[in-house]
Curated annotation (Swiss-Prot):
Taxonomic superkingdom: Eukaryota
Active-site residue numbers: Y154
EC number of this enzyme: 1.1.1.-
Record keywords: Lipid biosynthesis, Lipid metabolism, NADP, Oxidoreductase, Steroid biosynthesis
An example Gene Ontology CC term for this record: endoplasmic reticulum
A Gene Ontology BP annotation from the UniProt entry: steroid biosynthetic process
Similarity-based family: Belongs to the short-chain dehydrogenases/reductases (SDR) family. 17-beta-HSD 3 subfamily.
The protein's name in its UniProt record: Putative steroid dehydrogenase 4
PROSITE patterns linked to this entry: ADH_SHORT
Organism: Caenorhabditis elegans
Length: 263
């Protein structure tokens, strides 16, 4: 069984569909039952010879007991791949004390971006250790490698994922378990409020297919060739130029939001 969190939208949904295309049984985790039912139906309509299970979990409101119940359900099956995809960011770029929603939003971003990847990984590793086999894919972001003004907490939580996974690689390198970080740049999803795809901003289906093909080949990658090219080039760019790029990106996102409100 292959597990995907945040599995009913964007990259997570695309991961689930592409894993199903490859013939794997899927375990979907998301917060909205209607979307889970719809996604399960869509998968089975295309790939009727696989099994699809799901669990409802809102990671902004999840308790310790909720995590225990979720892990109990997950450990009832053999999990070959865990894709920790669920994530959350601010609605709009903003300096820390002016983030829309204030402390509630900041708490949600921290809870969603850090706790699931940590606790689900810890809860599923024992069965992988027993089999000496398993794959854990943690979806971060290039934002974790860049000091992005007006994305402070989001960027910092993505750095956590990168650091966390690199340590797991050291801890489990001789246990038959693959731990991989995916750090994409822009992907056309609802999270970035930009539906337009391009050579440098692929749609989620193209990204997921490319990313899955990197498992076993790279321990840390952007998951997509044009993203990797950009990421390697960024290493040679002075930070003042990167700051200007981030500022321009923030303005574009704000303009897009304003245009949507005018429609």
């Amino acid at each position: 069984m292959k597990v995907v969190t945040g599995a009913t939208d964007g990259i997570g949904r695309s991961y689930a569909l592409d894993l199903a295309r490859r013939g794997f049984n899927i375990f979907l985790i998301s917060r909205t039952k209607s979307k889970l039912v719809k996604t399960k139906k869509q998968i089975l309509n295309k790939y009727s010879d696989i099994e699809v299970r799901y669990a409802i979990c809102d990671f902004t409101r999840v308790s310790y007991e909720d995590y225990k119940r979720l892990l109990h359900s997950l450990n009832e099956v053999d999990i070959g791949i865990l894709i920790n995809n669920v994530g959350m960011c601010f609605d709009n770029p903003e300096v820390l004390h002016r983030v829309e929603g204030g402390i509630d939003t900041l708490t949600n971003v921290i809870n969603v971006n850090i706790l699931p990847v940590t606790l689900l990984t810890a809860g599923i590793l024992p069965q992988m250790m027993a089999r000496k086999s398993g794959i854990i894919v943690n979806i971060g972001s290039a934002a974790g490698s860049i000091h992005m003004a007006k994305w402070s907490v989001y960027s910092a939580t993505k750095k956590y994922i990168e650091w966390f996974t690199s340590i797991l690689q050291k801890e489990y390198e001789n246990e038959g378990i693959i731990c991989q970080t995916i750090t994409p740049l822009l992907v056309s999803t609802n999270m970035i409020k930009n539906p337009l795809s391009s050579i440098f901003c692929p749609n989620s289906d193209s990204f997921a297919k490319s990313s899955l093909n990197t498992i076993g080949n790279s321990s840390s990658t952007t998951g997509y060739i044009t993203h990797q090219i950009q990421f390697e080039l960024i290493k040679f760019v002075p930070e003042i130029i990167i700051d200007l790029f981030v500022k321009n990106l923030n303005n574009q996102l704000l303009d897009y939001q304003l245009d949507k409100k005018r429609v």
